[in-house]
């Protein structure tokens, strides 16, 4: 019988030394896919998952990777001082974690191998109004989280505990998650990036250490989402490096420039992903260039549905391509 070290030798090293077998296998799959094919992905944030229905109706297939949103699970939503738009978004997002769990279990039973990722628009742990994940709607100071004994730090850990409880349900079912906290920390529009990218980096490290060390969450693959070199948490904290790209207008692209900028600022030894895009990459260009994006994820609603951003022709081209991994 092979030893545990011998069994692990065939896998890419995970940031979490105690990562579950399923997480190790997922990371290895991503590594082996990158540059050979690209995994199709689509974000959703409501129970109906209208984006998936649209893709199925248009192409006859579904994305291999499905993104889910956790914003409604933020413990500190200020319902008394929220716009109708905010309240609608929260209401529509309720129940999506439970739906994600059900979907992932079904994927395993059916042998389809669908991949799950979470995005978390985290309402500020203290104070704030309306969509308080936006810096403009909260005076929450992320830098104070890094100081022992502050109310900000206590609230941060309180919220982390709440979200950990959700993630643990997936671990109990042996479901790995591409976990992308503190996304888009290269800018200041979210409170976790408002005090600079290095603060966001330190929050990411804090969460990694707490979730892997104290909460015993080992089903997560840790996705870093920034291309600022001085803010990179370090290889020991990261499984996947990623970037979000929203071009001002459509162009046929394999996002090669974004890839080079990302890996130059982070690591060429990690799996790389287009964690969010507005416009689909050109699958024909990708097949020629073999830029090693493991996956992409188109954003939700109008970025997927209709032809404001992605034409039916381009959507079909992606999902019909032998280079694209679909369900």
What are these regions (language model features)?
Residues 1-90, 285, 323-325:
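N-terminal module-boundary/linker segments of secreted carbohydrate-active enzymes
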Residues 5-8, 38-43, 269-327:
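Substrate-binding cleft of secreted/luminal carbohydrate-active enzymes
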Residues 24-25, 47-55, 98, 162-166, ...:
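Alpha-helical scaffolding within the catalytic cores
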Residues 31-32, 53-61, 98-113, 134-137, ...:
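Acidic (Asp/Glu)-rich catalytic clusters
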Residues 38-42, 64-68, 114-120, 177-181, ...:
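Hydrophobic faces of well-ordered beta-strands that scaffold small-molecule active sites
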Residues 66-69, 228-250, 298-299:
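Aromatic- and acid-rich polysaccharide-binding/catalytic face
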Residues 76-206, 217:
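Substrate-binding cleft of extracellular glycoside hydrolase catalytic domains
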């Amino acid at each position: 019988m092979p030893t545990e070290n011998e069994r692990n030798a065939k896998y890419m090293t995970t940031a979490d030394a105690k990562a579950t077998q399923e997480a190790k296998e997922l990371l290895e799959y991503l590594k082996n896919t990158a540059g050979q094919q690209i995994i199709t992905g689509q974000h959703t944030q409501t129970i109906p998952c209208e984006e998936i229905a649209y893709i199925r109706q248009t192409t006859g297939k579904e994305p291999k990777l499905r993104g889910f949103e956790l914003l409604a699970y933020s413990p500190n939503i200020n319902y008394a001082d929220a716009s109708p738009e905010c309240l609608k978004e929260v209401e529509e997002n309720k129940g999506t974690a439970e739906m994600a769990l059900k979907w992932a279990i079904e994927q395993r039973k059916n042998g389809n191998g669908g991949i799950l990722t979470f995005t978390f628009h985290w309402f500020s742990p203290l104070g704030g109004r309306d969509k308080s994940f936006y810096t403009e709607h909260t005076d929450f100071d992320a830098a104070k989280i890094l100081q022992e004994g502050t109310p900000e730090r206590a609230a941060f850990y309180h919220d982390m505990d709440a979200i950990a409880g959700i993630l643990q349900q997936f671990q109990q079912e042996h479901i790995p998650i591409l976990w992308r906290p503190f996304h888009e920390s290269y800018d200041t529009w979210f409170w976790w990036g408002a005090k600079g990218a290095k603060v966001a980096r330190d929050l990411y490290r804090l969460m990694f250490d707490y979730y892997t060390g104290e909460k015993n969450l080992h089903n997560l693959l840790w996705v870093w989402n920034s291309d600022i070199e001085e803010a990179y948490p370090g290889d020991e904290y990261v499984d996947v490096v990623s970037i979000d790209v929203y071009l001002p207008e459509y162009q046929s692209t394999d996002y090669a420039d974004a890839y080079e900028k990302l890996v130059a600022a982070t690591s060429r030894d990690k799996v790389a992903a287009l964690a969010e895009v507005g416009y689909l990459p050109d699958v024909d260009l990708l097949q020629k260039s073999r830029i090693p994006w493991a996956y992409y994820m188109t954003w939700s609603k109008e970025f997927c549905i209709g032809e404001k951003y992605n034409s039916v022709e381009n959507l079909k081209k992606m999902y019909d391509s032998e280079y694209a991994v679909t369900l």
